[in-house]
A protein has these predicted regions:
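Positively charged n-region of N-terminal signal peptides that target proteins for export
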Residues: 1-4
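C-terminal motif of bacterial Sec signal peptides marking the signal peptidase cleavage site
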Residues: 12-15
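Solvent-exposed hydroxyl-ligand-binding patches built from regularly spaced Ser/Thr
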Residues: 19-169
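Terminal non-domain segments
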Residues: 7-8
Length: 169
C-alpha cells in the first residue's frame, strides 16, 4: 500500500500543474449571502474591501411568487431561466476580504468549453476585476467579466471567506 501512495500523489501533482484549471473549488463553512459585487478597494494596509449590494437569488416557486408580486410575470407563468433576483433595497456595504479566500469563477477554457467552475486566488480575482491582468497571464482560461456580476459570498461575521460567481443560465 505504501508504494501506491507516492504514485497517486505524483499523478495528483501532475494534474494540478497542467495548464487546465481545476474544475472544483472547495469552499469554507460560513453564512452564504447573495450580492452584486460593485467594486473592490485596497485599504492602507494592503488588504481589500469588497463593495457589495446584497440581493436575494430565488429559484422555483419562490422565484415565481416574487416575480408575480413585483409584476415581472403574470400569475401562472414561470420566470425565465428558473431564477429571479430581488434587490428591493440598493444599499452598498463594505466587507473585508480574507486574502486567502477561495474564489470560484465560471470561465471559458482555451479549448472552447465554457461555464467551467474554476478556482483562483482572491488577489488574482481582484486584479481581474480591476482590469490589471495583461494578456496571457491567465493560463488555460478566459473570464469574461462584464458589469456587476452576482456572487454568493461566504461570510464569517463581516469577513468574506469565500466567493462563488453565480451561474446565470
Amino acid at each position: 500500500m505504501r508504494r501506491i501512495t507516492p504514485v497517486v500523489l505524483a499523478l495528483l501533482l501532475a494534474a494540478c500543474s497542467s495548464g487546465s484549471p481545476p474544475s472544483t473549488v472547495r469552499m469554507p463553512d460560513g453564512v452564504r449571502e447573495h450580492a452584486y459585487v460593485m467594486g473592490v478597494e485596497t485599504v492602507d494596509n494592503g488588504s481589500y474591501v469588497v463593495i457589495v449590494d446584497r440581493a436575494q437569488f430565488l429559484t422555483g416557486d419562490e422565484a415565481n411568487r416574487a416575480a408575480v408580486e413585483e409584476g415581472f410575470i403574470n400569475e401562472g407563468e414561470t420566470v425565465p431561466g428558473g431564477y429571479y433576483i430581488v434587490n428591493d433595497i440598493s444599499e452598498l456595504e463594505e466587507l473585508r476580504l480574507d486574502p486567502g479566500a477561495p474564489v470560484a469563477l465560471n470561465v471559458c477554457l482555451d479549448d472552447g468549453e465554457c461555464d467551467v467552475p474554476t478556482g483562483v486566488s482572491a488577489t488574482l480575482w481582484v486584479d481581474m476585476l480591476n482590469g490589471d491582468i495583461p494578456d496571457g497571464q491567465l493560463d488555460g482560461f478566459k473570464w469574461y467579466v462584464g458589469g456587476n456580476l452576482p456572487y454568493t459570498l461566504i461570510l464569517n461575521g463581516e469577513m468574506i471567506v469565500g466567493i462563488e460567481e453565480q451561474y446565470l443560465p
